[in-house]
Amino acid sequence: MKTTSEDANSIHEGSSINSQRTVQPVQARVEAMTIPTYPAGDPDPNPMFYEARNIQGSKGNIYPHPFTDRLSSEKVDRTYQAVVLENEFIQMIMLPELGGRIFAGLDKTNGYDFFYRHQVIKPALIGLFGPWISGGVEFNWPQHHRPSTFDPTDFILEEHPDGSKTVWMNEHDPLNRTKGMVGICLYPGKAFVETKVRLYNRTALPQTFLWWANAGVKINDHYQ
């Protein structure tokens, strides 16, 4: 095959266009998100010392954390502080106020929510401290479903030289005084999300723990 000077110029121009294409840094923002919610009631003012209250194999003594055993049957609109990470392929929404969970993950190329995205927040009383919700991705430690899965967490946004961004959500577990952090990281031009974990033992004694992520997805007869 013979390449003419005109063909060579076309190839050169095309290569220049491709080389000039730059990948945009990940966008990160904090925004208000209103979601219909069935609120949890006020916690019991009396401390819970009763150990025989077995929840998923755990002892029922949760002092010094209060216990909530009431849920409202009336739905209200509640505004949450949502942390959004986004690139050209993926949008991730985290809700630090609901246990530091991934609330939604959207494939922007086809509009598909690849995690189960709730339209209504409706807790059930199956958590060690009381309220628990499904959907999205729940990060659990130091035992089974995280005791504080419905409690608000702190968060901070972290920028990296390669244009990626991480939102770190963290809390101090009141039962064994350990600290757990989960980081949700999105990279420029990449169609995947990365999770990072940091655990700290703030005591002078060894502490046992497990770590697992509980992801919810919407399925049908053709789900793979």
Could you say what each language-model-derived stretch is?
Residues 3, 48-77, 82-86, 134-192:
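Extended, loop-rich substrate-binding clefts of extracytoplasmic carbohydrate-active enzymes
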Residues 125, 134, 161, 204-205:
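Intrinsically disordered, low-complexity regions enriched in Ser/Pro/Gly/Gln/His and often acidic
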Residues 128, 137, 164, 207-208:
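Acidic, low-complexity intrinsically disordered regions
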Residues 9-65, 82-86, 90-152:
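Acidic-aromatic substrate-binding/catalytic surfaces of carbohydrate-active enzymes
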Residues 10-19, 142, 153-159, 168-170, ...:
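Intrinsically disordered, low-complexity boundary segments flanking structured domains
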Residues 72-74, 86, 92-110, 169-220:
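Acidic, contiguous internal or C-terminal segments within carbohydrate-active enzymes
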